[in-house]
Swiss-Prot record:
Enzyme class: oxidoreductase
Species for this entry: Pseudomonas putida (Arthrobacter siderocapsulatus)
Domain Rieske: 27-134
Cofactor: record remark: Binds 1 [2Fe-2S] cluster.
Subunit structure of this chain's protein: This dioxygenase system consists of two proteins: phthalate oxygenase and phthalate oxygenase reductase.
A single BP term in Gene Ontology: phthalate catabolic process
Positions of [2Fe-2S] cluster binding: 70, 72, 89, 92
UniProt keyword Transmembrane present: no
InterPro entries on file: Cholesterol_7-desaturase (IPR050584), LigXa_C (IPR045623), Rieske_2Fe-2S (IPR017941), Rieske_2Fe-2S_sf (IPR036922), Ring-hydroxy_dOase_2Fe2S_BS (IPR015881)
Enzyme Commission (EC) number: 1.14.12.7
Associated pathway: Xenobiotic degradation; phthalate degradation; 3,4-dihydroxybenzoate from phthalate: step 1/3
Homology family: Belongs to the bacterial ring-hydroxylating dioxygenase alpha subunit family.
PROSITE patterns: RIESKE, RING_HYDROXYL_ALPHA
Name of the protein in its database record: Phthalate 4,5-dioxygenase oxygenase subunit
Amino acid sequence: MLTPEENLLLCRVEGDAPMGQMMRRHWTPVCLLEEVSEPDGTPVRARLFGEDLVVFRDTDGRVGVMDEYCPHRRVSLIYGRNENSGLRCLYHGWKMDVDGNVVEMVSEPAASNMCQKVKHTAYKTREWGGFVWAYMGPQDAIPEFVPPAWAPHEHVRVSIAKAIIPCNWAQILEGAIDSAHSSSLHSSDFVPARVGGAEATSKNWLRPSTDKAPRMQVERTSYGFRYAALRRPIQNAATSEYVRSTVFVAPATALIPPNNLYNVANINVPIDDTHTAFYFMAWGNPDNTPETETWRKFLGQQVGIDLDDSYRPLRNDGNRFFQDREAMKNGNFTGIKGFPNQDIAMWVTMGPIADRSDERLGASDLAVVEFRRVMLDALAAFQAGESAIGTGEKAIPSRICSFQAIVSKDIDWRDYQARYVWALDDANIVAEPDYEVHT
């Protein structure tokens, strides 16, 4: 439980809000690469931390991320002409390059040197892992871009589903790091089976446990924390634990325990105080990791079917998230197709910014409590002049990963040699009674 004041510190990201300023000290995904794949193509609107942006790929293939509004009369550049290595405003023809230099002012006298006196707000960018990234912190102290843990090298396949969610980033992040809810909310999609660990089929994720009350243990790190949800396995319960270890990488990434085929992660990028860009990634060996559209279909996150052209879910509170009550009577736990859509329903119905002053937290909420403590402690340190969490001396290590495994009770999960999934393991699937496996 947080006080109303603490809750606002955690959630607010716009303008001078301390949390937003701290988060700006990280390279942040702005949009998908596929949204700006074409040189001289249509500019794309983006919004981060309450700041309106325009994203475009110029004639030379360089990506620009700039203030959406022209420095002349503040007209939107979304409708501008993307041509000849710059973006030209339709109103008076001012043209900016990807660095924010005003390279043409056709409405000014030929002898004018006004171009040299005006600089448009633009941010340094990188392309990696299917995203356009921007550094929106101080532009005189831009850190080197470091590939994230979920895209460690260029040979990795990264398939991304994107959705714009009408609620605050923190309640989405809390859902991502909450292992306990999956045993209930996702029980029709995460099916208990006699397997040696979590396994993926084309329709389900399987897990070797029916335990709905995991014991939680947490370990704080310099970049966030990692924790374990310990469950009784279906087999060898007397000598083993089923461990699902999730990693929170500040400020807004969760490394989710993988399955036998590929790794899973998500990033929750604050659009503003009450909207979030939720990115759900499958990544790993190209031979095992689903292609992008296959991944989106599996999740129920396809544009034109589940989302509109702006990535907003067609399922919403107004249509009850297309909940099928008849399916619920026949055994489906939620009646909502696609487990991310089940999550979205929970996040959205908490309100635009969740009220954390009237909660009743239990033992299963340990990771949620730790997330709040970590971020508020990090914010206090940042306001006192220290570097932002996950930067400087507290930089995120290059090799961190989540894991899931059946582990002997003699082994502490903290000492388990975790590695990300790359090789393909053979599956021998036997479902538990009363559960159905779709392959």
